[in-house]
Regions:
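Residues within well-ordered alpha-helical secondary structure of globular protein domains
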Residues: 54, 77-80, 119
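Acidic/histidine-rich alpha-helical segments that form the ligand environment
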Residues: 105-142, 149-162
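Surface-exposed helix-capping loop/turn segments at secondary-structure junctions
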Residues: 54-61, 128-137, 175-180
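Bacterial Sec-dependent N-terminal signal peptides
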Residues: 1-28
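Well-ordered alpha-helical scaffold segments within catalytic/enzyme domains
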Residues: 47, 51-52, 86, 123, ...
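Acidic/histidine-rich, surface-exposed loop or edge segments in extracytoplasmic proteins
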Residues: 25-32, 92-106
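Short, contiguous alpha-helical
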Residues: 38-42, 46-49, 59-102, 142-190
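Short N-terminal segments immediately surrounding and downstream of signal-peptide cleavage
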Residues: 23-46
């Protein structure tokens, strides 16, 4: 019985010590989550521009191996997917790049890639800022496969997708003997 009383007393003391800290924790509002998403898109844009500026213009056609996309094609794919996923998530009209920019040789110059990529990020930032939070829980049927996701999931998948393809281009830059940009996990380079 003495052990039980000591255990209960210890538990209550511990709980009373910890509870004030727990009760002061603040829940995130949907507006906070939306603001963080906008911040993440702004950071992702800056980070991707670092990548575009790091790769020399004459190396945009470089492929790590013949069977994969070139650096320019990776970035153009990223840009078109940004537009597709964010427009699907938000229903906000996106700029039209035409189809398969990554297969167009004229789109693969450094200046063209920079234009398409920055335009796509500007759209994503605007779409995130102007998305209707009250609709984030709605399910959307994807126009391929048999997939259905919430708008919020699509917003997150858009961020995930661009990070994946930007990350793939790290090896392209390294194979040129160039150090890739510092990570911008918390804003500036780390």
């Amino acid at each position: 019985m003495k052990k039980i009383i000591i255990s209960v007393t210890f538990f209550l003391f511990s709980f009373s010590f910890i509870f004030p800290f727990v009760s002061n924790a603040q829940a995130l509002s949907m507006a906070d989550i939306k603001a963080q998403m906008v911040k993440d898109w702004e950071r992702s844009k800056a980070y991707t521009i670092d990548y575009l500026n790091t790769m020399p213009a004459d190396k945009y056609s470089f492929k790590a191996v013949d069977s994969i996309r070139s650096f320019a094609q990776q970035m153009l794919h990223l840009a078109q997917a940004n537009l597709f996923l964010m427009s699907l998530a938000t229903d906000l009209k996106s700029p039209s790049f035409g189809s398969d920019r990554e297969k167009s040789p004229t789109a693969q110059t450094k200046d063209s890639v920079m234009y398409y990529v920055t335009t796509s990020y500007d759209y994503c930032i605007n779409a995130a800022k102007n998305s209707n939070i009250s609709k984030w829980g709605e399910k959307k049927k994807l126009p391929f496969g048999n997939y259905e996701e919430t708008r919020f999931a699509l917003l997150n998948k858009a961020l995930e997708h661009q990070a994946h393809h930007r990350g793939q281009t790290t090896i392209y830059i390294r194979l040129q003997g160039i150090k890739p940009p510092e990570e911008r996990l918390f804003g500036g380079g780390m």
